[in-house]
Regions:
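Glycine-rich cofactor/substrate-binding loops
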Residues: 1-34, 62, 85-90, 281-282, ...
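A helix-coil-helix interface module used to build multimeric assemblies
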Residues: 2-216, 220-229, 293-294, 304-308, ...
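A structural signal for well-ordered alpha-helices, especially hydrophobic packing surfaces
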Residues: 47, 97, 104, 142, ...
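Alpha-helix capping and helix-loop boundary segments enriched in small/acidic/polar residues
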Residues: 122-125, 170-181, 216-223, 243-254, ...
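Conserved helix-loop functional segments at active or binding sites
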Residues: 159-163, 196, 203, 234, ...
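A glycine-rich phosphate-binding loop feature that marks nucleotide/adenosyl-phosphate handling sites
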Residues: 209-211, 287-291, 372-377
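Active-site-adjacent "gating/activation" loops or surface patches in catalytic cores
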Residues: 226-246, 250
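Glycine-rich anion/phosphate-binding loop at the beta-strand->alpha-helix junction
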Residues: 246-326
Length: 408
């Protein structure tokens, strides 16, 4: 663990950094700045490549490559320059604009500096950047991870399909089931929410300060700006929000977060059931020779991976409602209270990713205690009650259920 990790206030960037380091590429301050730079540059290039914008100075392909490199080669050193500019501007998006202007000047393209950020409000850049960050995380990381995780659940379900065992309803012995079937339940539930997350494509708007293309029409009222901006947003593989105020209404983001919240509940259920089967000695945990289960009771192998997953999933689900409820509400055409909340979107996903890794680790340690499971099943003849009273009903024996439970 690095010094920076040891000094982190949040365990996400401290204790659990190795479990969600990949999310730095999607939700860190660096990722946000880099994506803003990308959006600004791609908007400028989009304008330069659109023939109807005759007010722009002529440029060639070599110059376009120089412009493109501003975001393609963007790194931590360049991000530090943006942060230094922000100390002067006290405005994060304006700092990005100033940075790009300086970069254009440095490659001999001063003639383009006045067209950086043209027809944009900061929220055009911001909403598109956040949508892009979330969408890339959803498609590049979350969905592949879920698919891989659920594949392992299904393997366990198939492997343990023929291990018959007691089931428990209301904490009491109930009709028999199989260990594999109980894991198959979770496979199907996770698949359901995985499909919902797969449908949760993100959206963005690019229609100016109050959503009416005011500046755009001042620039050129003959251009079909909704069509132009739709084409630009679609180039990021995002859905286009034509109708908005200054802010994009975030309903697609809320849809995704709601689906993640529901998935989290299923994973909490899985964590608790695994914990309970371990406590019943139906599932054993493979012991590592170097790990310590308890500081005072060396015989113990605690189900810490499932407890860790449960705790972090609970944290994710405590944050998600706060983020959802705030981002769907904004005073009139815009207030800034959503800004600090948006910066915490990544936390909702980080706690989920920590949990998935803990669950993966915990599940790999599990093996069924076939002897214990078989002994308890064979010692529980009362669970045949359902089958017996059903056969009694078939043979038209009156009050079969009551007759079975009586002392007679």
């Amino acid at each position: 663990m690095t010094k920076e990790s040891l000094l982190s206030i949040s365990p996400i960037d401290g204790r659990y950094k190795n479990k969600n380091k990949e999310l730095e590429n999607y939700f860190s301050e660096f990722a946000l700045i880099k994506t803003r730079v990308e959006v600004e540059i791609r908007w400028l290039l989009f304008l330069l490549n659109t023939k109807s914008f005759k007010f722009l100075p002529p440029t060639n392909k070599n110059q376009h490559k120089k412009i493109e490199k501003i975001y393609l080669n963007f790194n931590l050193k360049e991000a530090s320059k943006v942060k230094s500019i922000e100390k002067i501007t006290n405005h994060d998006v304006k700092a990005v604009e100033v940075y790009i202007v300086k970069q254009l000047e440095s490659v001999g393209l001063s003639k383009l500096t006045e067209f950086v950020h043209i027809c944009c409000t900061s929220e055009d850049i911001n909403n598109l950047s956040y949508a892009l960050m979330v969408e890339r995380y959803r498609t590049e990381y979350l969905l592949p991870n879920l698919k891989s995780f659920n594949k392992e659940i299904n393997k366990m379900a198939i492997k343990w399909a023929n291990i018959s065992m007691l089931s428990f309803t209301h904490g009491q012995k109930a009709s028999p089931t199989s260990l594999g079937k109980e894991f198959k339940n979770f496979f199907h539930r996770i698949s359901f929410h995985q499909n919902k997350i797969n449908e949760s494509k993100q959206s963005a708007k690019f229609n100016g300060a109050v959503g009416n293309f005011n500046a755009h029409h001042a620039l050129d009222s003959k251009i079909n700006w909704p069509t132009i901006t739709n084409k630009f947003i679609s180039s990021f593989n995002l859905e286009y929000s034509l109708i908005s105020s200054q802010i994009e209404f975030k309903d697609n983001l809320v849809f995704l977060l709601s689906n993640v919240e529901n998935l989290n509940n299923v994973l909490i259920d899985l964590s608790k059931d695994a914990w309970l089967y371990i406590s019943k000695d139906y599932l054993k945990q493979k012991i590592s020779s170097t790990e310590v289960g308890s500081s005072t009771m060396p015989h113990k192998v605690n189900p810490i991976d499932f407890e860790n997953a449960e705790g972090n999933l609970t944290l994710s689900n405590s944050l998600i409602p706060a983020v959802k409820n705030k981002l769907q509400i904004s005073r009139l055409q815009r207030d800034l209270s959503d800004s600090t909340v948006s910066r915490n979107i990544g936390l909702c996903f980080a706690y989920l990713e920590i949990s998935l890794k803990s669950l993966n680790k915990g599940l790999k340690k599990l093996e069924p205690n076939k002897i214990k499971i078989k002994e308890e099943l064979q010692d529980s003849w009362e669970i045949l009650a359902e089958a017996i009273q059903t056969v009694m009903r078939k043979n038209k024996i009156s009050n079969s259920c009551l007759l079975y439970t009586s002392d007679a």
